[in-house]
Amino acid sequence: MTFSVDKVRADFPVLSREVNGLPLAYLDSAASAQKPSQVIDAEAEFYRHGYAAVHRGIHTLSAQATEKMENVRKRASLFINARSAEELVFVRGTTEGINLVANSWGNSNVRAGDNIIISQMEHHANIVPWQMLCARVGAELRVIPLNPDGTLQLETLPTLFDEKTRLLAITHVSNVLGTENPLAEIITLAHQHGAKVLVDGAQAVMHHPVDVQALDCDFYVFSGHKLYGPTGIGILYVKEALLQEMPPWEGGGSMIATVSLSEGTTWTKAPWRFEAGTPNTGGIIGLGAALEYVSALGLNNIAEYEQNLMHYALSQLESVPDLTLYGPQNRLGVIAFNLGKHHAYDVGSFLDNYGIAVRTGHHCAMPLMAYYNVPAMCRASLAMYNTHEEVDRLVTGLQRIHRLLG
């Protein structure tokens, strides 16, 4: 199948709008991606004609809604090549998935004197839950340091492991730098030291295929809204043997087997014991449509197009005076930069006046900002619906801002 960016763009209604009298150039998909009509229509159709509470309902609408929900679990398992759909838990997003692991597996397996390893490039969602766990139990948090080029100092990693290391939690792709970490060698090393591995895949799954069996990670988590799906829905993958051992994190309906005031409560089996309460069924339906959409386009086709676009963007940005780029030459999805000594917010505001949407701030990565000694960065992210013309507009906009601000 030949990838056609024009055909893809036609599926995204918002891309036809104007901002400040100019065509929208949406370069903020790493924060949240836009939604194709196929996703919008699937969720709307469910609410119009198929909505009902799932599980245990004997009537037709409930049974059909339950079947649709579980079919999305199956589709998601195929999307990341899990062994079984029952290794996947529906969560609100990457943040909740990581917190679930920290509060369920972490509380049961991390003790005083143990340690957890993260990296200096992590999103706060893959830092704060582990800080909280370490504070609760008296464990130590260890950090893989950064190199100036935005890669990790992996030569230091063997020295961070010891017999007390319980977990390595690491991002697949940095949300600021675009660095893709060499997970295969990292995971192998962690397992050699008896540690489990959690991978934050929020910035990876939309850019190329992910195979959790080939990676051999113990946990993998991602959000639907960055994958052209709805907000409020994500996937947590856990190896089946681990998932079966994990206690529930939240209590309520749907996750129980029996409830007795005198004899206590027993849990249903995984993954459903981690899905307390009424699920975001509409969001799940929308996620299924998003998975179907990108799978039909072909993730390898998407990857090839996006990499060509990234190479073009990096080459064109060389023409912008006083532009500082952060991250390695080989990267996925994002370009973080600052223009001279101007604050990122000012640069982003000027770009918005030109109809160009970028993200500004610390990007939920304050330790990374501290490493580069800056309060904020601008970040342009490139998705499958972005074009060479939009890159040209970004470059022209930055050149114009440089002339205006000096």
Swiss-Prot record:
Keyword Transferase: yes
Gene Ontology biological process terms in this record: cysteine metabolic process
Location relative to the cell: Cytoplasm
Residues in coiled coil: none
List of catalytic residues: 364
Keywords, ordered alphabetically: Cytoplasm, Lyase, Pyridoxal phosphate, Transferase
UniProt cofactor(s): pyridoxal 5'-phosphate
Quaternary structure and partners: Homodimer. Interacts with SufE and the SufBCD complex composed of SufB, SufC and SufD. The interaction with SufE is required to mediate the direct transfer of the sulfur atom from the S-sulfanylcysteine.
Similarity remark: Belongs to the class-V pyridoxal-phosphate-dependent aminotransferase family. Csd subfamily.
Functional note: Cysteine desulfurases mobilize the sulfur from L-cysteine to yield L-alanine, an essential step in sulfur metabolism for biosynthesis of a variety of sulfur-containing biomolecules. Component of the suf operon, which is activated and required under specific conditions such as oxidative stress and iron limitation. Acts as a potent selenocysteine lyase in vitro, that mobilizes selenium from L-selenocysteine. Selenocysteine lyase activity is however unsure in vivo.
Name recorded for this polypeptide: Cysteine desulfurase
Source organism (scientific name): Shigella sonnei (strain Ss046)
Highest classification ranks of the organism: Bacteria, Pseudomonadati, Pseudomonadota, Gammaproteobacteria, Enterobacterales
Protein's gene: sufS
